[in-house]
Amino acid sequence: MHDTATFGLTIVEHLQDNIGAGVKIAERIGFLRRTNFGTTFEVINKPDPNNLAYTSVALPLHTDLPNQEVPPGYQFLHCLANEATGGASLFADGFAMADDLRAEDPEAFYLLCKVSIPFRFHDEDADIQVHKPVITLGDAGEVIEIRYNAHLAGIFDMNYEIMPSYYNAYRAYMAKTRDPRYGLTLKLKAGEMVVFDNRRILHGRNSFDPSTGFRHLHGCYVDRGEFTSRLRLLARTVNIKS
C-alpha cells in the first residue's frame, strides 16, 4: 500500500482464481466506491456495451469517470483470463506528464489548471456531468489530480478569446499521453491484479481479438480517503511513514 500511494501503481500476484478474490483485498482496505456501473464491474467484450471498455477496441490512456464530482480513487483490476491475442494494458503517470508540461510550457500548464471543461457520461439510466479542470493543484502548488478522458470530455465551452490557446495546451498534454517515454505496457496474467490511483495514473489497453481467446478483468474502486486511512492505521504498527 505504501508503494501504491508513493508511486501510484503496484501489481499484486497469485490471487485465487475466482471473481471475488480481488474484491476481498479491496474490502480489507476500505469501503468500495459505488458508481453508476455498480459496486464492482467486469471488463469483458459485450454485445451491446454502454462503455468502450466493454468492447475489444483499443482504449487510449485515460482516467475513469472524470464526469463525477469526485472521481474514484484507487482502482483494483483483477485479471481472471487474458488469453486473446492483443489486449496488453497501458499505464502512464499523469503527474509526471503534468510536471514536465509545467517546466516546458508554463502557460499551457496554467490553462489546464485554471480553465474547466465539461465531462459527461449518459445512457438510458444516468446522465452525470461536471465542469472541472484537467489538472488540479494542492495548496502548495503540487499536482494532486488529473481528469483526462477524451471519450467523456464534452465540447469546450470556455471564452472564445482563450479557446485557441486552450486547444494548444490540451494538445500538448495529449501529446505526452502518446509519448512512449511515459508509458508502461504489460499483459496481465490470470491471477494478477493491478492497483493504481485513478486520479494520477492514466490507463488504457491495446485492442484484442476476441475470436482468439477470452479476456476477463474484474474491478472495483476504493476512494483515496479510505485507502490513506488504512495506510495510516497500518503505519501505527510498522515502521513506515504514512
What are these regions, as identified by a protein language model?
Residues 1-242:
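Active-site environment of non-heme Fe oxygenases that use a 2-His-1-carboxylate facial triad
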